[in-house]
Amino acid sequence: MAIVPIRIVGDPVLHTPTQPVPVGPDGSLPDDLPELIANMYETMDAANGVGLAANQIGVPLRLFVYDCAETRGGGTRHRGVVINPVLETSEIPETMPDPDDDEEGCLSVPGESFPTGRAGWARVTGLDADGKEVTLEGNDLFARMLQHETGHLDGFLYIDKLIGRNARAAKRAVKSNGWGVPGLSWTPGQVADPFGH
């Protein structure tokens, strides 16, 4: 296992839809997948993240790992991996997100957070690390995480979903940090935690 660099907004791998993880006729997964998943967990844990998509570490495959509580206030923590996820959600509100309840951050936009409109409920179906079907469903923070990580795999960052003044603030943050160009990354444990955990 290894902690690997996390790509920063502007890297093409973050802005390109990922490819499905190949599944053999017998349901088998690639032999090197366990090592990738282990590296993703270690990197996510070192970064104090609640989720990490494969393309955030430069691997353009459709899977993410997570370690997320049900709500912002806590509740049961869920940890796992979803391979080739398919997302369903309730309706996404068209109003401006609440700055207190809808704050969202991303390891690929380190240290920044912005109110982001998300559906209140989400479900993801896919495969677990053993190639068995898995369904995850939740509300609140868990639903937000499912939408956020699946969005990564579709080639979008949460800042791409921002509207109004929040979108303008995110563009300013990207510019002022010198992001938005290929080749930038940060490695958890080698730099201070950008979110101050």
Curated annotation (Swiss-Prot):
Keywords: Hydrolase, Iron, Metal-binding, Protein biosynthesis
Keyword Transmembrane helix applies: no
GO molecular function: metal ion binding; peptide deformylase activity
Annotated signal peptide: none
Cofactor(s) the protein needs: Fe(2+)
Any one Pfam family match given in the protein's UniProt record, by short name: Pep_deformylase
The keyword Iron belongs to this UniProt entry's keyword annotation: yes
InterPro entries noted in UniProt: Peptide_deformylase, Peptide_deformylase_sf
Positions bound to Fe cation: 106, 148, 152
Record SUPFAM superfamilies: Peptide deformylase (SSF56420)
Catalytic machinery residues: 149
EC primary class: hydrolase
Enzyme Commission no: 3.5.1.88
Note describing how the cofactor binds: Binds 1 Fe(2+) ion.
UniProt-listed GO biological process terms: co-translational protein modification; translation
Catalytic reaction list: N-terminal N-formyl-L-methionyl-[peptide] + H2O = N-terminal L-methionyl-[peptide] + formate
Transmembrane feature ranges: none
Similarity-based family: Belongs to the polypeptide deformylase family.
Function (record text): Removes the formyl group from the N-terminal Met of newly synthesized proteins. Requires at least a dipeptide for an efficient rate of reaction. N-terminal L-methionine is a prerequisite for activity but the enzyme has broad specificity at other positions.
Name of this chain's protein: Peptide deformylase
Record organism: Mycobacteroides abscessus (strain ATCC 19977 / DSM 44196 / CCUG 20993 / CIP 104536 / JCM 13569 / NCTC 13031 / TMC 1543 / L948) (Mycobacterium abscessus)
